[in-house]
Curated annotation (Swiss-Prot):
Annotated positions of the N-acetylserine modification: S2
Organism, scientific name: Bos taurus
A cellular-component GO term for this protein: nucleus
GO biological process: animal organ morphogenesis; creatine biosynthetic process; methylation; regulation of multicellular organism growth; spermatogenesis
PROSITE patterns, A to Z: SAM_RMT2
Residues bound to S-adenosyl-L-methionine: W20, M50, F69, G70, M71, A72, I73, A74, E90, C91, N92, W117, E118, D135
Metabolic or biological pathway: Amine and polyamine biosynthesis; creatine biosynthesis; creatine from L-arginine and glycine: step 2/2
N-terminal signal peptide: none
Name the UniProt record assigns to this protein: Guanidinoacetate N-methyltransferase
Catalytic activity: guanidinoacetate + S-adenosyl-L-methionine = creatine + S-adenosyl-L-homocysteine + H(+)
């Protein structure tokens, strides 16, 4: 007899967006898990992958935009790179407070930007960033697999300088896709992500990926596949 299927991360029609900003940011005592509204937002086992994303976003130096702060895993790695400025968008009150405290300790200038990216990104100037790292949590069942495309299409391409690098992830989506539809992570990315990148204006020969081996803990609710994929998307 097979084990019962795990409860999906989102129920049909579920929308966390109205309550997300003010909801408590539940960092556990060991600072290895962050939950908001009961959703598994981030876990420290992701560290090697977050560091790969950070390295990609900071690879051109200069001014880096990070969308979503979480547990500061990627942000701390970005600060180790020879960058000039580090702009960070975060909407949750508790996470933003942690961002403000963290910013005071960093070697490079941090510009904390409070709000949903949908509110903040339109206020940012064109061709302003050398690198972008987008890693926010989906706030509804409707946008579970697609929220990153809205940012990429509406903002990422225009915000990057020519030669700038976009990297991003949606582990909550990709974990589900690798569980239910795909066995090869590169194929998953090619079929579900590349079309949206092309639509946003990026060229196919400027879209690369790197795959790393990383085995999640057995109790991780959102990701079980033993590989992770890092997009490296350059604006021409």
């Amino acid at each position: 007899m097979s084990a019962p299927a795990a409860t999906p991360i989102f129920a049909p029609g579920e929308n966390c967006s109205p309550a997300w900003r003010a909801a408590p940011a539940a960092y556990d005592a060991s600072d290895t898990h962050l939950q908001i509204l009961g959703k598994p937002v981030m876990e420290r086992w992701e560290t090697p992958y977050m560091h790969a994303l950070a390295a990609a976003a900071a690879s051109r130096g200069g001014r880096v935009l990070e969308v979503g702060f979480g547990m500061a895993i990627a942000a701390t790695k970005v600060q180790e790179a020879p960058i000039e400025e580090h702009w960070i968008i975060e909407c949750n009150e508790g996470v933003f407070q942690r961002l403000q405290d963290w910013a005071l300790q960093q070697p490079h200038k941090v510009v904390p930007l409070k709000g949903l990216w949908e509110e903040v990104a339109p206020t940012l100037p064109d061709s302003h960033f050398d690198g972008i790292l987008y890693d926010t949590y989906p706030l509804s069942e409707e946008t579970w697999h697609t929220h990153q495309f809205n940012f990429i299409r509406d903002h990422a391409f225009r915000l990057l300088k020519p030669g700038g690098v976009l990297t991003y992830c949606n582990l909550t989506s990709w974990g589900e896709l690798m569980k239910t539809k795909y066995s090869d992570i590169t194929t998953m990315f090619e079929e579900t992500q590349v079309p949206a990148l092309l639509e946003a204006g990026f060229r196919r020969d400027n879209i690369r990926t790197q795959v790393m081996e990383l085995v999640p803990p057995a109790n991780c609710r959102y990701y079980a596949f033993p590989r992770m994929i890092t997009p490296l998307v350059t604006k021409h």
